Amino acid sequence: MTLEELRGQDTVPESTARMQGAGKALHELLLSAQRQGCLTAGVYESAKVLNVDPDNVTFCVLAADEEDEGDIALQIHFTLIQAFCCENDIDIVRVGDVQRLAAIVGTGDESGAPVDLHCILISNPNEDAWKDPALEKLSLFCEESRSVNDWVPNITLPE
């Protein structure tokens, strides 16, 4: 048995628990951000916020289903948003289930118009630092992922 195999055996349960914890934390963060009114949904809306006030953005979620993987325009937008977030020290994750995300944050805005959930930004509600335990857990998760060169980790949302 090699060292890699031994390490692989130890990290599988740990990484599964870590992933589940991150998914639960993301679920809590999305609900909290939505209640406080500091959630921006949509690729174009998010790009506007990132352009105008990137220092106020604390977290970014990119979401795409399997059928979205073939959408070249969406993938280009994702690449640009990822680069911008990395450049501005904004934690970023990917979610592979847009339907589950829609169940958490809803599918329409105040007027009932459908919302693009491919990109979600979470901003500070005011100048004071927003202390949310779920945000802190996710920041730690992202930091740990970056330490193993996983710059945009995938998170599975809980059922």
Curated annotation (Swiss-Prot):
Disulfide bonds: none annotated. GO terms for biological process: apoptotic process; cell differentiation; regulation of cell cycle. Keywords: Apoptosis, Developmental protein, Differentiation. Residues 43-86 are annotated as: Homodimerization. Pfam families: Ribosomal_L7Ae (PF01248). PANTHER family: GROWTH ARREST AND DNA DAMAGE-INDUCIBLE PROTEIN GADD45 (PTHR10411), GROWTH ARREST AND DNA DAMAGE-INDUCIBLE PROTEIN GADD45 GAMMA (PTHR10411:SF4). Belongs to the GADD45 family. Two central helices mediate homodimerization through parallel packing. Undergoes concentration-dependent homodimerization, which is required for growth inhibititory activity and enhances interaction with PCNA. Interacts with GADD45GIP1. Interacts with PCNA. Involved in the regulation of growth and apoptosis. Mediates activation of stress-responsive MTK1/MEKK4 MAPKKK. This is Growth arrest and DNA damage-inducible protein GADD45 gamma. It comes from Bos taurus (Bovine).
